Each structure stands twice: as C-alpha cells, then as structure tokens.
Amino acid sequence: MLELPLKTDFTGKVVVVTGAGGVLCGDMARAFAQAGAKVAALDLNEDKVKKLAEELKNEGFVCEGYAANVLEAEQVKAVHARILEDLGKCDILINGAGGNNKRATTDNEYQHEAKAGQTTFFDLDTEGVDFVFRLNFQG
C-alpha cells in the first residue's frame, strides 16, 4: 500500500514530470520533491509550471519548471537538453501529460436522439479528436 508522503528517499534522483501544471501531476512533482528528488516539471501552460517550481523552491526543494508541448519533438528535445544542463540525467519519467479538448467532446454522451444545436459524435471536429489522441497516446 502506498503511503503519502512518499517514504522512499529519492535524494540525488532526477524526476521529470510532464503535465505538472495539472492537479494530479503537480502533486506527483511535489511528492517527489518532498522525497528528495530534483524535479523537472513540464507543462504546456508556462505560468502554471513556473508557479509550481517557484512554490517548491520557496519550500526548499529543487525544482525547475519548463514550458513544452510534448507533441512537438523539437520542443521536447530542447527541454531535454536544458534538463540535462540544469539537473542532470533523468532517472524517473512520469509521463502524465494528457487531457481532452472541447472540440473532441459531445454535448451529451448518453443521448439517443440529438436535439438541434447539440454536438453529437458525428459532429466532432476531426482536428480536435486528433489532438486528444496524439496528446494521450503519443505525448
């Protein structure tokens, strides 16, 4: 059974957390920092990930925040180089980036007959669905 905070000592380990601007992955980043890890927090939302990194640093932990779109290989490569320089080689990767997109969501998932103006499966934006697929499967 997992006990929080983490009881394992991660001192000296570099933990990279994608999606760290969100609630779940932000808490994972915080837990690893509290357990002694040097944390690289990545997120598409630069403001959120920089705020998390600042909070953890103010609490005495080692954390760097990086803005990156995990669907863009060049951004990931650039952030990887910065992490190597700032914190060292990644020991643990929490590949937590994911989510949904309004363009890939229907108005009512259990509706049998669509009402005028409601988005059904057949009305979904293919680019929105593709974005969600790539983010959650490839990202």
Protein language model regions, located:
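The beta1-alpha1 cofactor-binding region of Rossmann-like NAD(H)/NADP(H)-dependent oxidoreductases
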Residues: 46-47, 67-81, 126
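Canonical Rossmann dinucleotide-binding motif of NAD(H)/NADP(H)-dependent dehydrogenases/reductases
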Residues: 3-40
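N-terminal Rossmann-like NAD(P) cofactor-binding module of classical short-chain dehydrogenase/reductase
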Residues: 91-94
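Hydrophobic/aromatic anchor residues within beta-strands of the central parallel beta-sheet
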Residues: 63-65
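Active-site beta-alpha loop architecture of Rossmann-like, nucleotide-cofactor-dependent enzymes
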Residues: 23, 96, 100-104
